[in-house]
Amino acid sequence: MDGIKTLQPRQPYDAPNWVRTDRSVTFAELKTYEQQLQSSGLVPDAITVALNLPPDLYLLRANGIDMDLKYRYTMPPVKDSSRMDISLNDQFLQSFSLNSSQDVNKLILRLPVLQGLLDGKSEVTIPALRLGAVNQLRFDFQYMNPMPGGSIDNCITFQPVQNHVVIGDDSTIDFSKYYHFIALPDLRVFANAGFPYSRMADLSDTLVVVPKAPTQGQVATLLQALGGIGSQTGLAAINLQMTDDGNQIKNKDADLLLIGAIPSSLKDDTKINLLVEATKSWVKMPMRHYDLASIYPDDEARTPNTRTDITSSGPMAAVIGFQSPYNDQRSVVALLADSPRGNELLTNALNDSGKRAAMFGSVAVIRESGVNSLRVGDIYYVGHLPWFERIWFALSNHPILLAIFAAISIVLLAWVLWRMLRIISRRRLSLDDE
């Protein structure tokens, strides 16, 4: 290979492995092999579709995801309880009867996300769902398959007939109505989706900062990190920038990936909560720590409460995420280790799905015993929301303020209506007087 030349610049969120978010997508585009959307058998195997999404899709006030589903199936011999069950991320959504008299098999659905939906009985019957970077949509076709009976004197032979089910390639799912907005730092989206670097699939918005004389372990860590991001996006990192001069980062509008050490220009104790220096480091512990990555503590809970000095005789590594001091829409992730064995632990952790699942928050400490993550320090936001969505987002974590805001809005609306009625009434009276 003599070289790579980019013929057309990449666009944000156009990674080959991600579902398009600028338009509706057909199921044919989501297939990874030819026969994926069909199944056969007495009880057909489930049909599954992977939905790999950008982790910064803003779904806080989403009513659901629109899906236009077209499907075909072998009709049951009689009208019975045969059905199609739809599940998302192993959570049941809804079932539809396989009616033997049905002519057109087309459904226009709205997949619920975050909040439960109300059915016609005004009861919450659909569970709240949460979309992640990797999701699985599953269709189970359940056939009753009645078998004729016999007796000792009258033996009946029966040949089971296979059932065939197909999800149409022209079925569509639409994520184009949602904004891109996320709270960071969150090492979970870096470890499992390569975000924010994977926003540009070719890493054209990424600047890698390496030591002037990187060790073999640091090079291995770098290659593992870039390879992991490429496996998530489906595209090689052909346009990333790399430097060994920490002073160059001030003039770059890019997300920074630091390998081995933090440049002196970025050392800010208010943003960096862990420094790996030889075998000694310190960690600021928050007021309250949550083991579940899905729980985001409030500002008070994230405030450092104690400072713990750690002296470790064993190897140690760390992954740290914080906001770039040069651009409030850019992020920094540092991959640090204290020794060659620490680099090996870090590289292995980035290659281990179980250890990556344990990374979240702003700091992940990696030792021989495993991965420990903390969420501490300042939160910043990357992406764009319209002003009205910003208001709802700001009030979402403050229900009392939301109630006060709603009450004031109702009072103002009532006052406006009252004034309008008064004006109309006066006009009518003046016309009557004339």
Regions inferred by a protein language model and the residue ranges of each:
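Solvent-exposed alpha-helical segments and adjacent loops
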Residues: 1-434
